[in-house]
Amino acid sequence: MPKTPVPAVAVDHVDLAYSAHPKNPAVLTDVHLTVPTGEHLAVIGRSGCGKSTLLHLIGGLLAPTAGDIRVRGDADPADRLSHCALMPQGDSLLPWFSVRDNVAVPLRNHGVARRVARGRATAMLERCGLGAWATSRPSELSGGMRQRAALARALLADKPVLLADEPLGALDAITRGEIQDWLAELLAGSGATLVMVTHDVDEALLLSERVVLLADGHVVGDWPGWFSRRAGRPRTEVLADPGFAASRTEILRSLGGVAEAVA
């Protein structure tokens, strides 16, 4: 019999409570989630529902109260972290480093020689449209450019799993749309597994093949995304597609139902 492929991420009936006291409810309760290798998954939900906590658990930065978490079959937190490139909220660039040296940080942390790391960082910045800013400080870049540099750093780490926490959350609508298109193009050829947290339903649908809704510490919804169905179509055309609008409406209706249920 052929072997069952090992998923990139497996979250098996996981609970997380910061305290056993009954007045402190669990952050996550019986969360079960499997992400096949190469899939792009978006996790949406209201503030405080446990989205970022779930990412930290997957990446080995937190330990669950109960349940099992594996990344590429490994349960040990250090091994899980070794498979993941983490992109926290905000650009998190080091202000005293050049943009190029910021992007090279993951390579330098893994012992890659400085000259080689800088060369690879420069090539990635060229792909990202930031080649002219390689020797600049982060303070000289716009918010969108800093976010693009942070994404470039995460992608240059060349890890099989990318964990992104609100990667475009602090950007204006126009810049967000531009970077969504750019990121979709990069992800299409990367082969990486993406687990992304976002509060933006359009962003979730555009950048993922699957969208799950987290509410009150539980997974309460699961829908197909539109990443594969975009097929190189411009973002504006996809947003105007009646099928996309129907997907958005269904998810927003579920979000609204969650809001009414917890009100």
Residue ranges and their predicted role:
Residues I44-R46:
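The feature captures the beta-strand-to-loop junction immediately N-terminal to the Walker
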